């Protein structure tokens, strides 16, 4: 096919779409099901209606081929686990008794059975449930979900492409099952897994699928020759199947690297590549391997992870270059649109001009359709859209929101000494222990306490004008009193105020910092039914006034025990926001760090002796390619130290991280120079404690002993077992006792029981230590 004919054949498609519905209907229905207020048939009916509405919306917008199977009640990787029959032994009875309840038990756990581990989906803010595989794992195909959802789309008269997690990525995302040898590699199960995928592909072909998309994003990370060989073998074998659909292998989030020539030569019919941000180098790499002669290329030129409008002219230029490299070039987003909110049209509080800088899922869909039209019919067919794109981009570049001279001057004046504590840790820790007087194995929580219905109602009442600010603050003070009282009665050593005034750990600060924008309906899925509204970091950042001081000092007035000041760190403020793309991330991080530094200093001046600066996103924002790590970690750790280095030696700086693998950033954790770090560890059985010990981490640490992502209450015996494991890696004088993460999403009953068990565990082990 010539470049001209390839252009004429251009189609518009997407890899996936937000699942929740315009008003988060799916979240509400699932939580209603868990509480017994919604029946299983009602939940399934609502889910089918949401899928149909999404498909119709995409088709009406001009999408030629809609995705099927991207919908999920909880997580698409968990759906894949069900599809291949890799149900953990402890969950098989529940799944056999009731497939839906068993599915949710794998995701959330029960009082009797622990859930699957949860971790970040590559470097995004989405979480997946980690498959557990062992030498004895037997795979069996169950394509019910995939075939059913394809049939629903076909019944609407649509061209649909089923979307699956690819077999090699699935195995690379997995971990050894409990009881498996520690050195077991799930990838060794590829020969068992491929026949199951072959059966699913056959089922989908029989159900009418012309194309099936197999996602292999694991190969945008550095991979070994053995892993690349597994990729080659997988698609050589799947490609050799006779009765199968056409195969479109998709990658996203970064450049494909050494996997690109493997897939370019594979006996598949199509390849989907990301051409945004760091992945823009895929264009030159594709040319270097000779392109994709005789194959379909789906070009991800619209950024599926950020919310800024597309530079249509630049994207058309990229598409024009790609025309000579494949038999057919289609247009898409860089990844699933799962990672962005649904529609800017729902926003009423953002200035109309600024709103024109933004593109959520519906607007990105329109951009994709526009680009496909421009590619197929020429730029004359989209002159109006191109003119609007140029005007909106110029408006953003010239806005005073994006450039504040005072902020820029302060950031440029930062010196190395500004990001360095006045004394080394060995000297600081003695001053802190003398000042705080804490027992061995001190107990604390990570920050937030349950956000009850009463708290949410108070926030809604204030927003809707049913109460004034004085009435709202009275309710917040009452909640803080209750939280402090509970912690004192329970016997916790370092307290928190519970954060009842905070809607979200990033949004709360973003709403008080100049340069951020807030949305009303910009919800994106974090995990399961947990949705967040990432703020939009649109311009230069400054702090007009203190943000947390009065609530922290109020809480401290209620107790003699230390109350932690609680802040969200600069890297997490970026990672959990939609961040401006018109300057380097390190420059933006420095601006945020300086604003937070002022808050840290104000907290100390108000008498706060323990200040926690959370950086749960430090690891998840790590670039996917090792070649990019050093530059990222340099600015990320500097931003943290810039935030925290203005305090006295006897002020104890804490930080917190969660949701991630920490082994490859232990040096960076050390470079933060925090006095105490708390980490998620309960589901991974204290693995992080051993990683810290192997590195020789010299400071205090609190690997979590209570998994807060499950409603299950861990017994004191379970917590004690985890703590004893932690003590094998971290000396008692440097070990803290705490949950994995904040308690915002938990209910009070399990919170009370779990924290009482946590304190009892610490006291038991203190006794054992003193006896020894």
Swiss-Prot record:
It comes from Streptomyces coelicolor (strain ATCC BAA-471 / A3(2) / M145). L-methionine binds at residues 446-448, 499, 614. Zn(2+) binds at residues 656, 658, 680, 741. The active site is at 709 (proton donor). It is an enzyme of class 2 (transferase). InterPro entries: Cbl-indep_Met_Synth_N, Cobalamin-indep_Met_synthase, Met_Synth_C/arc, UROD/MetE-like_sf. One of its GO terms (molecular function) is 5-methyltetrahydropteroyltriglutamate-homocysteine S-methyltransferase activity. It catalyses: 5-methyltetrahydropteroyltri-L-glutamate + L-homocysteine = tetrahydropteroyltri-L-glutamate + L-methionine. The gene is metE. SUPFAM superfamilies: UROD/MetE-like. This is 5-methyltetrahydropteroyltriglutamate--homocysteine methyltransferase. Catalyzes the transfer of a methyl group from 5-methyltetrahydrofolate to homocysteine resulting in methionine formation. It comes from the Bacteria.
